Curated annotation (Swiss-Prot):
One MF term in the entry's GO annotations: ligase activity
Biological source species: Thermus thermophilus (strain ATCC 27634 / DSM 579 / HB8)
InterPro entries recorded: Bacillithiol_biosynth_BshC, CC_BshC, Rossmann-like_BshC
Keywords assigned by UniProt, alphabetized: Coiled coil, Ligase
Protein name, per record: Putative cysteine ligase BshC
Gene it is expressed from: bshC
Family membership noted in the UniProt record: Belongs to the BshC family.
Amino acid sequence: MEAACLVRSLGLPQGEEALKARLRRPGHPRLREALAAYLKRLQAPEEAFRALERLEVGAVVTGQQAGLLGGPALTFYKAHTALCLADRAGAAGVFWVASQDHDVEEVRHLHLLRDEVPETLSLDLPPLPSGRIPLAPHRERLRAFLGPWAKDYRLGYALEAETLSEFFARVLLAFLGERGLVPFDPMAEELAPLFLEALERELSDPLGSAEAINREAERIRALGGKPPLRRKPGATNLFLETDQRRLLFYEGGAFTDGVRRYTAKELWEIARADPSRLTPAAGLRPVFQDLVLPTAGFVVGPNELRYVAELSGVYARYGLAMPALFLRAFGVVVEPPVRRILEKYRLDPWAFVDEGEAAFLRAAEAWLAPFRAFRDRVEGLLQEASRLVEEAEALEPNLVRPLRRFRARVGGEAERLRRKLLAAQAARDEVLARHLGRLKVHLLPFGLPQERVYPYAMYALRHGEALRRLAEAPWEGRVALYLG
């Protein structure tokens, strides 16, 4: 079942009317103070500080793992949707930096397209949350890979970060801070203490949220859906970080991370000493987010929408109204060389993103049709000459020899025409192959949609108008951004 259909079937809140109905919900009483301190440490632009005032109205929240250079372009499309919705509601646009995530494979690669060649930097990162990974050991490799772009003042500012997650947050501020985007890093020293009350409550009933998820999963299955979240017996929705981040299980009145056992009191003492060590799993993270932030709207991708759809029971358990859910905008950047190719074949960029080579060959068919038509007409002339010889044999034998000479001359000329036609078509086929290759590199790198590979910061560094074009783009649906 499609994620959007599932959300409708479950009757979950969607749309701007639902967003407006959820405004003016209070966040954590120390939220503004903590965020102001966090933004001050990051030397955020004034627009981000001013956005804190709009938290009194509410927040439209989105989030993503802390990828290099802001991660793939979909990060900026999420932020764009959140900012547009927030502006329309008079609320703040907040970006949750998923610094607690320890899946480093998702964030250790940076892909850039330069001189028509995709280049990749892969960092060797420890299996830790990105909020724990220092940037210093990787700073020079990043600078070298970025080349002249590393001298851009925005990247100079971002590369001053202490950790990988801070680098990500600084990139967001450098490129989107002037639009008032407010990053929120739950592992930041200023912000992590805001989750203590939520942690205390979860520790008091450690299986309650997991059971709520499993009940909702059964409901979704009954509707024909495939719920992505399911908690194993005894699994909680909390991770504990020691030498690495491990899921906690609860049985017989005690917790275990598979290495040692803990009482609830011991875990609470760990959390009080350093609240960033006890963090929520995917099934609890949005609820923890909304216990601290005055979330009225939540912008997600299609896969996230599926797992958020399972959380209505967890929201109810915490006495929270689920925020209005919105799918992010989907974007594709079209630079001048690609635009010329697309226009030549009258090919829509999204058709190529969806179907790749098949869409291109369909569009190229019209370009090759004249060659085929001309070849068919030459073949027709040869066949007509042969028919004339056959008719002459029955009509007047004296015409046979001259008509055979005529057919031979026509055949010789036709063969020369055929060779020239093949050479011309081969040249055109070479052009087709070159054009197809260029489209793949730009729009479907590594066989994936562009928005999942190249960072939007790359386009902003290459094209001065890239951020303005994004700001002017629709906040929902599919968007083609023509640059250059």
